[in-house]
Curated annotation (Swiss-Prot):
Pfam families: SepF. Residues 16-43 are annotated as: Disordered. One of its GO terms (biological process) is division septum assembly. This is Cell division protein SepF. The gene is sepF. The keyword Cell cycle applies. It comes from the Bacteria. Belongs to the SepF family. Keywords: Cell cycle, Cell division, Cytoplasm, Septation. It is found in: Cytoplasm. Cell division protein that is part of the divisome complex and is recruited early to the Z-ring. Probably stimulates Z-ring formation, perhaps through the cross-linking of FtsZ protofilaments. Its function overlaps with FtsA.
């Protein structure tokens, strides 16, 4: 039993404290509830960028080599429409780039349309293109 008392002292369980003490009651204090604070309504100017968070973006690209198709496809997968001008690329490279972008447009649910002699419009799924410019490509206006 002596070991029991020494272990209890070791763990701080000593019987030498007084259980018979009277606690004085503390007076009850009335606290008034604070009304909820309202945000400061003095900000009456709203930035234009916050007013249109879903603004559409159209990029214009003029590739020179086939590897430029990767950056065009990146913009298309990010949800931007891209106008691509193939004036500085030979016909074989332009065909390869169009094939690559056609696959990218299909993957994102978009489309690619020819809007000029060497100009294409690549759009993701959230763009709607109306009208047909390709039918008028053969007739050019002379002055």
């Amino acid at each position: 039993m002596a070991e029991k008392f020494s272990l209890s002292k070791f763990f701080g369980m000593n019987d030498e404290y007084d259980d018979d003490y009277a606690e004085e009651p503390t007076p009850a204090t009335k606290s008034t509830p604070t009304p909820p604070t309202r945000p400061n309504d003095s900000r009456k100017v709203v930035a234009m960028r916050t007013a249109k968070p879903n603004a559409s973006h159209i990029a214009i690209c003029e590739p020179r080599i086939y590897s430029d198709a990767k950056s065009i496809a990146k913009q298309l997968t990010n949800g931007d429409a891209v106008i691509v001008n193939f004036a500085r690329v030979d016909e074989a490279q332009a065909q390869r780039i169009v094939d690559f972008l056609n696959g990218t447009a299909y993957a994102v649910g978009g489309e690619i349309k020819r809007i000029g002699e060497q100009i294409f419009l690549c759009t993701p799924h959230n763009f709607e293109v109306s009208g047909d410019v390709a039918a008028n490509l053969g007739t050019q206006v002379t002055r």
